[in-house]
Amino acid sequence: MIYGVGTDICDVRRIRASLERHGERLAQKILSEAELATWKERSERWPDRGVRYLATRFSAKEAFSKAIGLGMRMPMTWRHCEISKAASGKPEIVLHGPLKDWFETRQLSVHVSVTDENEYAASFCVVEKNDF
């Protein structure tokens, strides 16, 4: 059964401008430790890809927060929600801490799709209630 859906579109130029103003602090606020390591690696080699990586993570986390109905309120935090990828390349959401507990208590599962182009990143998220 569908528990919730969420979508988000992010202007990559806005993320770029925020990075120019706030530097790495912005990435540290939004990204998990694993995501931060990937962001740093990409940013060093291809600065534009680093910005788009941050924008896609921002977008996916916003879409997820809408799908679970919490928005950016506890237990939903930027760093407790990690966008990872399966061996196949498919994006996955990995939850940590109180958000993971909240999600598992409700027997939920999640599907996420992420895309980006030069100026925009977009995400769509479907959360299902599992009937075991």
From Swiss-Prot:
InterPro entries: 4-PPantetheinyl_Trfase_dom, 4-PPantetheinyl_Trfase_dom_sf, ACPS, Ppantetheine-prot_Trfase_dom
Pfam families: ACPS
Keywords carried by this UniProt record: Cytoplasm, Fatty acid biosynthesis, Fatty acid metabolism, Lipid biosynthesis, Lipid metabolism, Magnesium, Metal-binding, Transferase
Major location (coarse): cytoplasm
EC number(s) recorded for this UniProt protein: 2.7.8.7
Reaction equation(s) it catalyzes: apo-[ACP] + CoA = holo-[ACP] + adenosine 3',5'-bisphosphate + H(+)
Entry superkingdom: Bacteria
One Gene Ontology CC term in the entry: cytoplasm
Obligatory cofactor(s): Mg(2+)
EC category: transferase
Binding site for Mg(2+): D8, E62
Ranges annotated as spanning the membrane: none
Subcellular location: Cytoplasm
GO-annotated molecular function: holo-[acyl-carrier-protein] synthase activity; magnesium ion binding
Entry's Gene Ontology BP terms: fatty acid biosynthetic process
Gene3D superfamilies linked: 4'-phosphopantetheinyl transferase domain (3.90.470.20)
NCBIfam families: acpS (TIGR00516), pantethn_trn (TIGR00556)
Family as reported in the entry's similarity comment: Belongs to the P-Pant transferase superfamily. AcpS family.
Functional summary from the UniProt entry: Transfers the 4'-phosphopantetheine moiety from coenzyme A to a Ser of acyl-carrier-protein.
Protein's recorded name: Holo-[acyl-carrier-protein] synthase
Organism: Polaromonas sp. (strain JS666 / ATCC BAA-500)
Highest classification ranks of the organism: Bacteria, Pseudomonadati, Pseudomonadota, Betaproteobacteria, Burkholderiales
